[in-house]
Regions:
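Accessory RNA-recognition modules of RNA-modification enzymes
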Residues: 1-124
Length: 125
């Protein structure tokens, strides 16, 4: 989806401009691990999750402002910073910081309304 591409580009350029280190899983060093995006197909609500280690400290307020200024078809309803210091290469959270909004979005399917969070399993196939 075009919104996801815009968000990915924004986040990539933000960290590239600031020369922020990416996580090297073999050495277990670096800051930026993953970007997780979730979007409700019918609602257009979007959750943005930036997953990092705690090895560095960065103020993500300006990233939040850049994301919220993007011209999107849908709407960002939540921006989260998840801290993950696990050795495994999996998206999980040792600590979650809500930078903006809420930690869930809604999706509707067959007249039902579902509340979907970061780690919800939702597979409407």
């Amino acid at each position: 989806h075009e919104d996801m591409t815009k968000i990915l580009t924004c986040v990539h350029e933000y960290f590239l401009k600031r020369n922020v280190s990416y996580y090297k899983k073999m050495q277990h060093t670096g800051y930026l691990r993953h970007l997780l995006l979730r979007r409700g197909v019918t609602t257009g609500e979007i959750l943005v999750h930036v997953i990092t280690t705690s090895q560095e400290e960065h103020d993500l307020e300006s990233l939040k402002e850049e994301l919220l200024a993007l011209p999107l078809e849908g709407k960002i309803v939540g921006i989260m910073h998840l801290i993950n210091d696990s050795l495994s290469d999996v998206v999980q959270s040792d600590e979650t910081r809500i930078l903006y909004g809420q930690d869930f979005f809604y999706e509707t399917l067959l007249g039902l309304r579902f509340k979907i969070s970061t780690f919800s399993f939702f597979q409407p196939n």
